[in-house]
Structure formats: structure tokens, C-alpha cells
Amino acid sequence: NGVLHRDVKPANIMLCEYGAKLSDFGLATVLGIGAAGSPKGYTTHLPPEYFTTRSTTELTDIFAVGITLFRACNYIADWDGTIRRLHNPIGLIQAGTLAQAIGYNVYIPLRLKKIINKAISAVPTQRYQSASEFRQSLERLRPGIDWHPSAAGSFEGICCTSGDHFRIELTSTSRSFNVDLKKNNRRQLQNCSSFNDMGEAYHFLHEHIASTLFT
């Protein structure tokens, strides 16, 4: 629609009963054909080409939305703190490799990672070329179970179609590490397993999360 927001970030996304709404258009501009906006934006959400051209385009917003989605799906609450712990964060931002340096949580499905990675590609021509193209890729994902961490080694979720409640958790004994899945407080034996190694148990748990986030 010719409007460039230039400040897409979690703080500017408002949640309501109808879904998510983008807010704070204080830096927004209307672009003409072939025009580019002035150098504005949230530094950590800017694409690498900005640091050489000092201009913003629709691809700048697409990159910023991709970074916002990356933060949301990985539950990164302390974004600034996460960046400060990285080696040479300014260099990573300017190279467009900040998200790659941080990495995804292991339970993020490959299909979602591919969509985000395309949106935040360091090469502008390899990104989605329009917001509608980006949206269409996301809409092809069919939500399965809406999982969220509830405690260390534990996730709870609601099935987006049936409303069933799920809980999966890792517990340990002196001899084993156990992953238990419950549906509406009933243990689902076919999805429970025991392991001698904690890493293998976590891998099993995270694989289940990743395989059920979308149908």
C-alpha cells in the first residue's frame, strides 16, 4: 500500500481480541514509485544494505518483521542482553548475521525457520519481495498445538483445533531421564519414553514440540 513503517519491533505490536496490530507510525512514510525512505529504524532490526545505502525500502520492513518473528518464536525477552553477550554484535548487525549468531531454539520447526531465514536474508534479492508474499508463506502453515515453556524441561500447549490441553515434561530418577506427555491430564503412552542420557531425552522432547507446532 506504499506505506513504509520503519520501526517494526515487538514493542510496537499490540495484541487484542482480534489478533495482533502494528502500532506507532511515528517514523512511517509514504513511498512513491522507486522512492526510498530516509535513514530511520531500530538499529538491531535494520538489514545490512542500510549501513551502506543509508536508505530504507519495503525490504527494510520485511527484514524487520523477520527479526521480530525470530525474537517472538524463540521467546527472547531480554533482546539487548542477548546481543551484548555476543562477540562483535555491531559487526553481526551490519553483516545481517545477528539472528544466525544467536540461533534458534531447538524446538522451532524447520518450515518456520525457512520462512524467517528468507525474510532476514543478508542478500536483499533473496528476501521476500513484498509483504503479501511473506504473509502467504506464513498462512500456508497450519497451527497444531500452541506450545509454550511452563518450567525448566516442561511445556504446556492447547490444540488450536480441538482445544485439548497438552503437557510434556522431562523428569529424572537415579537411573533414567523420562519424557511424559499428557493430553487432558491423561498420559499418552505412545509418546512417552525413557533415556539413559539427558541430552537424548531433551532431544526427544524438543522433536515432539517441533513436530506438533504445525500440522
Segments and roles (model prediction):
Residues 145-215:
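Regulatory extensions appended to serine/threonine kinase catalytic cores
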